[in-house]
Amino acid sequence: MKISKKRLMFPLLLAAAAAIVSGCSSLLSGDPDGSSSESAELTVFAAASLTEALEEIAEEYQKAEPDVSLIFNFDSSGTLKTQIQEGAVCDLFLSASPKQMDQLETESDSLLPESRIDLLENQVVLVTPKENEKNVDSFDSLAEHLKAGDILLAMGNSDVPAGQYAEKILSWYGLDMRELESKGLVTYGSNVKEVTAQVSEGSADAGIIYSTDAFSAGLPALDRASEEMCGKVVYPASVLKSSGHQKEAQDFLDFLSGPKAQAVFERIGFSMAE
């Protein structure tokens, strides 16, 4: 019996079409049996002082998790907190102070329950340009120069954690911020990187920044603020409740707590939170 080629090809074409549709469905649905998996794009909001550390850690993480893309938004913790509250897409937030994280938790219920951790600790330090024309060598001498009115200090503004720590230090010495401002003795940066740049470029006589930023900029830390002067400098981190990639965000946060990331953090000057 002779079989028509047309009659034979029709069911074969149907079978081929079904296989293609099935394969496409598997890929679109992220089926583990599909030929490839869907990649995740994580948006990480992080304090500006974490820039160098996270960029280096990201390279290591991409080797371990090639299907996860990391997009960083570095700025002051106060600015990032406001962006999150205004609806910006963010999967993971790393703040330079508990204050901004607390506000996200209490004011807008933005944090994924039980994902928040204290990740790192830093130190607040005094730096000057390499010339150090004012011969500042300690917070004590900085305070004396400010009282004498013969120095320009760079610090973060009031919604930047680095600025808030600086204000505590100046208050500890009995200095009044309004008086310092009225005499033109302070200049502000919108984040700690701007403050660091002002000192590095010599546009300010001294600056109050983090130990890690001093290290990255090659500026010697002339003095370190005690916990009594400004409190403990803790960096909390949390997955956001609104994240579309909560598992991947938690996985990256776990990696940041692990030994490979720890080695990078500690080399730059951070310590892991207790």
Feature map (PLM): residue ranges:
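Sec-dependent N-terminal signal peptides of Gram-positive bacterial secreted proteins and lipoproteins
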Residues: 3-28
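Exported/periplasmic ABC-transporter solute-binding proteins
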Residues: 24-59, 78, 85, 97-98, ...
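Conserved beta-strand core positions
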Residues: 42, 68-70, 124
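Ligand-binding clamshell of periplasmic/extracellular solute-binding protein-like
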Residues: 74-81, 90-104
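Active-site phosphate-binding/coordination module
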Residues: 113
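Signal peptide-proximal N-terminal region
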Residues: 59-72
